[in-house]
Every structure is written in structure tokens, then in C-alpha cells.
Amino acid sequence: MVKQWNLINRGDLFTGTEACEVSRSVVGADVQCEEAWKLSTGDPSIIVAVLDEGVCQTHPELRDNIWTNEDEIDGSKKDNDGNGYAGDIHGFNFVTNTGIITWDDLNDTGHGTHVAGVIAAQNDNGGIGSIAGGTPDKPGVKIMSCQIFAGNAGGNYMSSVKAIKYAADNGAVILQCSWGYTSGTANSYEWGTPGYADEEQWETLAPLEKDALDYFTHNAGSPNGPIDGGIAVFASGNEYANSAGFPGAASMCVSVAATAADFTPATYTNYGPGTNISAPGGDRDYYWDYGEGALRGEAGCVFSTLPYNVSETGFGYMEGTSMACPHVSGVVALGLSYAAQQRRHFTADEFKKLLYETATPIDEYIQGTKFYYRYAYDLGYTNPTQMMLSNYTGQMGVGQVNAKRLLDAIAQNGTPMRFPNLYIPLDGEVTTLPATFFLNGESLTYTVTIENQAVATSRTEGAKIIFSGLKEGSTKASIAASDGTTHNFNITVRKSASGSGWL
């Protein structure tokens, strides 16, 4: 973890030098993973959709945590599962409109692979660490690649809209979006035309984007899983501006500002209105005194996975609110993993409330003056400069995301999961996994009792219980676990049933 202060910060990485006598790292200025991992390291039932460049699916750190659409055929030009997308075995390329995810365009930066590594690189395998990537023995969360950038192409309005809906419809509960429009208060000399001024303007001029995000936040997840609804996480932007960029600044989203290894705002981060929470994003200009040549300041950035066509080692440093964003996505994924393992259920709003309430307060560190170096592109040299931290006090959202406090809160909140009411087509079947609704369910056995077996019957096949619809009507039923827990539920059989199984 020496290079990953963002996950475990011992406060000893950036000690004083001749050029910089003040330590620029603080113990615990990370996302508090170390203690959280004692509770959970991730769960494969949680899917994170990465809307970005394509994620390198063959990377040794990521390949075991790539989402697979089991009902699709790799490389197929036919829509085998009927979801409207052909060949979407690991996600979909919304740039080329195919199921072939790419990460090797000459102009690709590895951005999508880098953010994916922060969330779900596999731990304890000799490579890097991640927030929710699990271990070789305990699989972590899954990454669904929704490709909206490819080299110099992509990133248009409709590709992101389609990707957001695709993610909701195919099982993702978290949107990881390290992109957005320029802040509405950005300096026009440096950044060109400012972006949307407020949420009303964004809703008026980008209505399909708003509708897609509403769709995700309300329709992702399940009323019978750890979360009903979805969490859309966006970068606040890198324009040094005093308001976050949209779509992240919209009320249904989580907008993430960036911090350095001492809890201070990253020099480039957007902040203020629209900003919800902070996370480590790296700050190369702040750590310019550390390292030599091309390596200057690198250690103050975020270390993660990269495609091998971008980095010969498969790893590298990046910075930005783009890198802060996946820390929040990763902590949300870790929290939902723990909720799934503890069989706790939340609405999306309830979960976001816990995310905010458990953040680490950081205003005590945002005082005085912060000195850094900034490259002046119009002048062609690096210029020493400073920022008044008082401008950022109370403006970095609720504080820094805290995995351990979130997981502790999850154990004390939400509602217990219940075996769901079933909706079965006449002469059809619905397959259930009862272990997912009972604490420590994998170690239990189950007995189903159906009051009216003329309406429906059940049979057990390994870990599955399969229900068959025999006659139109309804009946009460119960499922008893070997630990003494019993859940009551209803079964309805209809000709018009969709076969989804859940009422």
C-alpha cells in the first residue's frame, strides 16, 4: 500500500524535505478501508457500471471481477437474451454500437481501466489494492463496462443516455461517471464557454439526460435486494471553480470533489454548490517538490490499473475529480456488498443519507494558505502559486467518504430482507435462491410449505428452489430455514405473468 495512500494513509508518505519542510500527509486521510475490510471486501452480487473508456477486461487485476451477461454470446451479432443489445457479454460499446469493448485505441488514456481498478482490482494477488475488489478466495464486486468514449470519439449526449438506461436494465446499482460538463462558474478564459448555470437550465436543455438519471435512480436495484433504486456518482469537475459541473450537480446524483493526502482540497477541484462529498483524487501540483523529472509529484496522485498499451507495467498514476469519483463508487459498492451479506435492505435515498452522515469531517484541515505549482500553458512554464483555503471551508460537501463508518451504520439501519412474493406465469416456472434472503443463508437448508398446491408447487435443486405455476389463483406460502427463521410470502399464478418472479 506504499503507493496507495488513498486507501491506507499512515501519514508518513510526504514528510518534510529541504524544499518543503511541512508534512503534506495526515494519518487517516484516506477512505478508511483497512478496518472496513474486516467486515467486507466486496460481493459479486453488486454491479458497478463504469461509463467511460472501455475497461481492459484482460487485465490480471480486473479479469475476475468483470461482469458477465450469462444469457449472451461473446461476439454475437444476434441479441440472444432479448435485451435489445447484441453480443453484450461484458457490457456494451455505445460509441460503435456493438458488444465489443475496446481499450487499445491509439488515443485512449486508460481512464476507464484506471477508475475500475480503484473500485474493483482484485486484492491479495501480488498487485494493487482496491476498495471492493475482493480476493482470489472471496470475489469482489463486478464491473460492467458501458463504453461512451473511444480515443477521440464518443461522449455524445445520446450515448450516455443509452448507457445509463442499459446499466439500470441489466443489473447495475451504481453508476461510476468520471465525466461531466464544464462548471457554470468556470473561468471562460481558461475553459471556454461555461456549462449549465443551475439545475433548472440543465433539466431544460438536457431533458433526456435528466430522464435517464431519474430512471436509474428509481428503477435500478430491487425491492428484494440490498437496494431499491440506484446511486449515480459523478466527478464534480477540475476547473478550479466554485460550483460543481452537471450532471453531477443535479439533486439525484452524488457529486465528488477531490482531496490531497492531508485532507486539503486538491488544487484543481470544483467545490461549492452541487458538491456532495469528497474523496482522494491526488494533487500533482501540490506534491511537485517530491520526485524528479517526469516523476515529479506522481506520488501525490492515485495509483491504479492501466491497459498495457498505455503502461508497460499495467499500472500508473492519475489525478482529478475523475479519480476521486471511483473512491465514492467503490465505498458505495463495498457498503452494498456488506448490506447484501448482512441481508439488509435500503432505498437509494436511505443509503445516500447514510453515505453523507458517515463522512469524515475535514473542515479543520481546510485553513490557512496552500502553496503549489501550476503550469501556465499560455506562458509555457511552471508558476508557484497559492490558494486561500478559507474559500473551501464548508464547500467540499459533507466531508470525506468513510468506508468503515458507512459499514457500521449499515449494520444498524435499513430493514431485514424478506423472501419475496412470487408472480408465476401459468404453466411456467420461477427460480429463486433462498440463501440470499437469510443471514448466513449459504450454510442453511430450507423447507417450503404451500397452502394450496393445486395453484403452485416447489422443488429444490441444489441451492435453488424452483416454483411452478399450475392453476390461476393465489396461495399463501412460507419458507423455513434450518436456523429457525421463517418467512411468509404469497404466490400468484396468472396467464399474463411476465415470468420475472417478483411482485
What is the predicted function of each stretch?
Residues M1-E21, E34-W37, K165:
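Primarily auto-inhibitory N-terminal propeptides
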Residues R10-A29, W67-Y85, H90, T96-N107, ...:
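Surface-exposed intrinsically disordered loops and tails
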Residues E34-Y157, N170, G180-T185, I227-D228, ...:
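Subtilisin-like serine protease catalytic core
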Residues L106-T113, L205, G237, G314-S329:
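Gly/Ser-rich catalytic serine loop of serine hydrolases
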Residues V118-I119, M144-A150, K165, V173, ...:
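Hydrolase catalytic cores
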Residues G399-N413:
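Catalytic cores of secreted or luminal carbohydrate-active enzymes
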Residues Q412-L503:
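Extracytoplasmic soluble-region selector
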